Structure formats: structure tokens, C-alpha cells
């Protein structure tokens, strides 16, 4: 199933990236947390990359995988996103461990909504690509 996103919805999603709650959460995490969890680090890096790339969705390029899932990193990752008031992400991770990570994410109450694309500002994306295919999840 392909999701067709209108310009209005795309702008609403873009606004989500810049929401005060998410910005405050991740800036506070960066500035005050001396020992962030691995899940918080995954979430922070995703927020930072999405913001720097001016992505129109909250893009996650790398999910916790392998032993990290058993160690609770996915749970920490979802908790950090929830604390930042992020309720939708697009996963563009293309690693070989993706299926295990997708199942672990869904087990942490995420709902796989379908496939989608995230548009990045080509000036802020080193690869120069604008549209990246991914999986859309809701919490």
C-alpha cells in the first residue's frame, strides 16, 4: 500500500519535526543528560538528522537491531520518541537486520501503517537524494 501525502499533510508532518516539545526534549537530552540510554541516542540522532536534512517526516535511518533489541534498546528508543511527543516516524533503514527490527518496533506498540517516502532538502543531504523510500509507523 502506497501512501499519497497531500501538501497540507506533508507540511503538518514537517511542523511535527519542529514542534517545541520535540525540540525541547532533544536539546535538553543533548545538554543535560550525561549518560543517555542507547535508545535515547538512536532517537536523538534521528531527530538531529531529520532536522539537519529538513526532512518532511521524522526519519529513522537506523533502528536498534540484534542483541540491542534483547537488551531493551528498542523499548528505550520508543520511550524517547514518546517523551518527545513524536507519534509517527518513517523508517528508511536498509540494513540486513531490518525485519527483526521492524518486528521489535511493532512489539513495542508501534503500528506499521504502510510504505511512504520522505523528502529531504538536497542541500542538506550529502547523497543529494530528495525522496527516500521507507516504512511509516504510528505510535
PLM features per residue range, with description:
Residues 114-139:
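C-terminal edge-of-domain segments
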Residues 26, 43-45, 112, 125, ...:
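Compositionally biased, intrinsically disordered low-complexity regions enriched in proline and serine
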Residues 1-100:
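An N-terminal amphipathic alpha-helical segment
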Residues 100-115:
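Short, aromatic/basic amphipathic alpha-helical patches
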Amino acid at each position: 500500500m502506497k501512501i499519497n501525502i497531500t501538501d497540507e499533510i506533508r507540511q503538518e508532518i514537517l511542523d511535527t519535526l519542529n514542534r517545541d516539545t520535540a525540540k525541547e526534549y532533544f536539546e535538553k537530552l543533548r545538554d543535560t543528560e550525561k549518560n543517555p540510554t542507547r535508545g535515547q541516542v538512536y532517537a536523538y540522532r534521528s531527530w538531529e538528522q531529520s532536522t539537519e536534512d529538513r526532512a518532511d517526516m521524522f526519519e529513522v535511518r537506523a533502528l536498534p537491531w540484534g542483541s540491542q533489541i534483547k537488551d531493551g534498546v528498542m523499548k528505550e528508543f520508543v520511550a524517547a520518541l514518546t517523551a518527545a511527543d513524536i507519534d509517527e516516524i518513517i523508517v528508511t533503514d536498509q540494513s540486513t537486520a531490518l525485519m527483526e527490527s521492524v518486528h521489535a518496533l511493532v512489539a513495542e506498540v508501534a503500528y506499521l501503517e504502510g510504505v511512504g517516502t520522505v523528502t529531504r532538502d538536497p542541500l542538506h543531504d550529502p547523497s543529494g537524494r530528495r525522496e527516500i523510500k521507507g516504512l511509516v509507523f504510528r505510535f
